[in-house]
A protein has these predicted regions:
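Extracytosolic ligand-binding ectodomains
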Residues: 4-392
Length: 392
């Protein structure tokens, strides 16, 4: 098995790469500008998404501090959270001789960046379609999530998975997952985004009313019997809400937040137990509000290295006295990746180094850059008694 290249992010790891080389070349590094690593930063630093952009920028500053190399210079520019703002700021970076840029965050901001020459953009988007040739989608994409779910599905031997998705902004993503059909879905459904309508739709999918009527019919029959075994059965049935089983063994829901909670709660109200049917969703970035919902128990989702995320969050909070946006961990890793490539190429950055076939390891886990996207090796976690438990 090929050994992963490890770009070192934490301070103690950075010095294990080649601390002697740093000391021996420190005077040489300061001698010429060619030894300086210039990194452009393209984030929304004003407007609606300013808080998000500032969180990403602080994560990069934290990585810069951990690397502790004065020959790395960052050049933050405001993308304004849109394509025009990103293009105009990228032109300025281009004029200043910047070759590598972290950002932008949003897929929409990439639209005009193919007009920029001689710059590679490490975008934090998780959308990996229609990526410009000079950009890399570094976010936690759906392909990486599906890949690890497929392996886990095979291991636990589930064969009848329902695909559920809302009629919303996730329509394209849901269609992509359905059409690719890596998970071999048993049936697919869409549901209304109105929480009041979701329950009725889930009842229909699970045949709740039919199972409820089956129970009522069986109870009426048993009530007419004086047999001991029928009386015992009646006692059990009176504690139940439906009779019979559903015709699926797992459910994969492409959704987030309150709407995801509504869907899973509707399954619970439809008498579909999460102890018997396994529920899955996409990466949720360890949303702790799930702990407060009984319906979210045993919910499974793919994600990054949780232990490293907790370490990052703690260090960020201690440094800046505020909580980070969890996704900002990727911008921290992006600077570590760029530094690793520069450091290990005689202090020169070449874009082709990012496509090393042996892959890399960051705080978010192992990954390989291929076809203008990062392919991550993710884990599977489940919600269990106010904890996120790694199961795969």
């Amino acid at each position: 098995m090929k050994k992963l290249l490890t770009f070192s992010i934490l301070t103690y790891l950075l010095f294990t790469i080649n601390s002697n080389a740093v000391n021996e070349n420190s005077s040489e590094n300061n001698a010429g500008n060619e030894k300086v690593l210039k990194v452009g930063i393209l984030l929304p630093l004003s407007g609606e998404f300013e808080v998000l952009g500032q969180s990403f920028l602080k994560a990069i500053q934290l990585a810069l501090y951990d690397i502790s190399n004065e020959n790395i210079k960052i050049y933050p520019k405001d993308s304004k959270g849109n394509a025009l703002g990103a293009y105009e700021s990228a032109k300025i970076l281009e004029e200043n001789g910047i070759k590598i840029v972290i950002g932008p965050i949003f897929h929409e901001s990439l639209k005009r960046l193919n007009e920029i020459n001689n710059i590679t953009f490490i975008s934090l988007t998780n959308k990996n379609k229609n990526i410009p040739k000079n950009a890399i989608a570094f976010g936690i994409n759906i392909d990486s999530q599906i890949a690890v779910l497929k392996k886990y599905f095979n291991e636990i031997e589930i064969t009848k998975t329902l695909l559920l998705s809302p009629n919303s902004e996730f329509t394209k993503q849901s269609k992509y997952v359905k059409d690719k059909d890596v998970l071999n879905f048993y049936r697919t459904y869409t549901y209304d985004t109105n929480p009041k309508k979701i329950t009725a739709e889930i009842e229909k999918i699970t045949k709740y009313r039919e199972r409820k009527k089956d129970l009522e019919r069986r109870i009426k029959i048993l009530e007419k019997s004086d047999l001991y075994k029928h009386k015992q059965e009646l006692k059990k049935l009176e504690q139940m809400h439906t009779l019979g089983t559903v015709n699926f063994d797992s459910v994969f829901v492409i959704d987030f937040g309150e709407r995801l909670k509504s869907v899973l709660t509707s399954f619970m109200f439809s008498d579909v137990s999460n102890a018997k049917v396994k529920f899955f969703t996409i990466n949720q970035w360890f949303d702790e509000t799930f702990f407060n919902e009984n319906a979210m128990q045993n919910l499974h989702f793919p994600s990054i290295d949780f232990n490293n995320l907790k370490k990052f969050n703690k260090k960020f909070s201690n440094t800046f006295n505020e909580k980070p946006n969890e996704v900002s961990l990727l911008s921290y890793d992006a600077l570590g990746l760029i530094y690793y490539c520069w450091f290990n190429n005689n202090f020169q950055f070449k874009t082709e180094q990012l496509y090393n076939k042996k892959g890399f390891r960051g705080l978010h886990g192992q990954f390989l850059i291929e076809n203008n996207q990062s392919k991550q090796k993710l884990n599977i976690y489940k919600v269990s008694e106010k904890k996120f438990i790694k199961v795969y």
